[in-house]
Design a protein with these regions (language model features):
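A generic structural motif
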Residues: 115-136, 271-283, 294-309, 386-387, ...
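Internal alpha/beta domain cores that form substrate/cofactor-binding pockets in large enzymes
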Residues: 411-479
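Active-site-proximal loop/helix segments of hydrolase catalytic cores
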Residues: 10, 156-163, 168-229, 336-376, ...
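Hard-cation-handling environments
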Residues: 222-378, 382, 406-407, 425, ...
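Generic beta-strand/beta-sheet core signal
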Residues: 11, 95, 182, 213, ...
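His/Asp/Glu-rich metal-coordinating catalytic cores
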Residues: 1-62, 69-266, 270-274, 280-283, ...
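Short helix-loop-beta junction
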Residues: 108-112, 401-410
Length: 479
């Protein structure tokens, strides 16, 4: 967002498909680091980051991030690299898990220059030049960045440290304006996240423009709290005697992983982290949440070349030892066929060699190098991840189900609590905030349209609705 020739960036993520393309390219060895060449086709990133086309990069003052998930932070290294070309060294304000994760991303993408990171969880560490003099809303972390006063409002999500951002604009006469960026959120009144009284106060004090997510806008009611995950696991797995327990899960969903840690302990098993990505993310999260993630774990890698002391190749795990572990493999929802979980299923339960299954067939390299598990009727495969919402993801899910059917393992696709609000969550947020303007983000145009139909249509007065039609569309808030 831009004001008075100053710009702050509210989150900067990559789509999962683009993310995986870039990771594969980053891991290739054909780089000329002396020329600063990172990716052979940087237009892939530029196309996904319209800010690089529509904003004068010299005006960027900072990145302000809501939480550490890839679709909110993974473009930051690339945008930061472009800023540096313009002589701009923008700091990053975010949570400690996001700091740990981003440092790893910079390393993964082989971008050597790091920005200055500022944690939004400890105001005492904030440099004086960024300390806001806003006495209101004492419970919120605040930073003064150029003309903006940015406040981090705690919300519930599928990670333990997630925030909405309230950005106060300079007062003009009697007019006080605020941009409220929801980030990914749901309401959890049990924990008081978000603090609705503070949001109500913000709405009463300011004329608000709301930038709102739309992932749960098709679903009636409210999303369940994270504690339900532990209850569902205990109810389902306690008396279920299975040899192998393989879980497909996103590696950054701390509450879910914590629930599986608790369950593993009750079953007398160790957590088995499958793959480099799951391991790196887990260990970063463990560092960020030392009082939460603390179970005993073992690392398994998908390739023999990554074996080192204390790390075992998955292919060397013997069936007689399956009962020792509860295996967690990276799935990143249903988007692609190249996650560690998909590699396991491709080799453990190959599908018929035909065009119908071509996308999910293992390559020769996967068949020879990937650690192959023996999966059968005495085992269970659990999907603890978001339901598919695009056609490609639905096809991917269909192939996954065929793999599991081919393996004859028990399949449980429903051990998941969404990290996103539903229609009632959105309505309660907007009733408290009373925005003048609403701009949707996330997903397809249909879902953004549903936000207007299912939520805004019930508000009095009805806010103005601006639905961006293409990436890079700008909205000028003047009235």
């Amino acid at each position: 967002m831009e004001y008075n020739n100053e710009t702050i960036i509210l989150d900067g993520g990559l789509s999962i498909v683009l993310y995986e393309t870039l990771v594969r390219e980053a891991q290739r060895a054909s780089y000329d680091h002396t020329q600063g060449k990172i990716f052979s086709d940087p237009t892939k990133v530029l196309a996904h980051a319209p800010i690089l086309r529509n904003v004068n990069l010299k005006t960027v003052k900072a990145f302000c991030l809501s939480h550490e998930h890839s679709d909110h932070v993974d473009a930051v290294p690339f945008i930061y690299r472009e800023l540096q070309k313009e002589g701009v060294d923008a700091p990053v304000f975010c949570t400690k898990p996001a700091i740990d994760g981003l440092k790893y991303k910079f390393q993964t993408y082989r971008i050597k220059s790091l920005p200055k990171f500022h944690s939004v969880e400890d105001s005492s560490e904030l440099p004086k030049r960024y300390r806001a003099r806003e006495p209101r809303y004492p419970s919120l972390f605040k930073a003064k960045i150029g003309s903006f006063t940015v406040m981090w409002v705690p919300v519930e999500h599928s990670t333990l440290n997630a925030y909405s951002l309230a950005v106060l604009l300079p007062k003009k006469g009697d007019r006080k304006r605020m941009v409220f960026y929801s980030g990914d959120f749901k309401l959890d009144q049990k924990e008081g996240r978000p603090p609705m009284h503070t949001i109500r106060e913000l709405g009463e004090d300011h004329e608000a423009l709301l930038i709102c997510e739309t992932i749960g806008v098709k679903s009636l009611g409210m999303t369940g709290v994270e504690d339900l995950m532990t209850e569902k696991l205990e109810e389902y797995l306690t008396n279920l005697d299975k040899r192998l327990i393989l879980v497909a899960i996103r590696s950054t969903e701390v509450p879910r992983i914590h629930a599986f840690e608790i369950m593993a302990t009750k079953l007398g098993r160790r957590i088995g982290l499958v793959g480099t990505y799951m391991t790196k993310a887990y260990e970063a999260m463990r560092k960020s949440f030392p009082g939460i993630l603390r179970g005993d774990y073992k690392i398994f890698v998908m390739s023999k070349k990554n074996v080192k002391r204390g790390v075992q190749w998955l292919g060397d795990l013997q069936p007689k030892d399956y009962r020792k572990y509860l295996l967690l493999a990276e799935a990143r929802m249903w988007q692609t066929y190249s996650t560690d979980f998909h590699q396991i299923m491709k080799t453990a339960a190959p599908l018929p060699q035909d065009e119908k299954h071509k996308a999910c067939m293992p390559t020769d390299e996967e068949l020879t190098k990937t650690g192959k598990l023996e999966i059968g009727k005495d085992d269970i495969v659990i999907f603890s991840t978001t339901d598919p919402y695009t056609e490609k993801m639905r096809i991917c899910k269909m192939h996954v189900e065929r793999h599991v059917k081919a393996s004859k393992a028990l399949f449980y696709p429903g051990l998941h609590i969404s990290g996103h609000g539903q229609i009632c969550d959105y309505r309660l947020l907007m009733e408290a905030l009373k925005p003048k303007v609403v701009i949707p983000f996330h997903r397809e145009k249909l879902d953004r349209d549903l936000l207007q139909k299912n939520v805004l249509g019930y508000l009095e007065p009805t806010p103005q609705f601006f639905n961006p039609q293409t990436n890079g569309t700008t909205y000028e808030w003047t009235a």
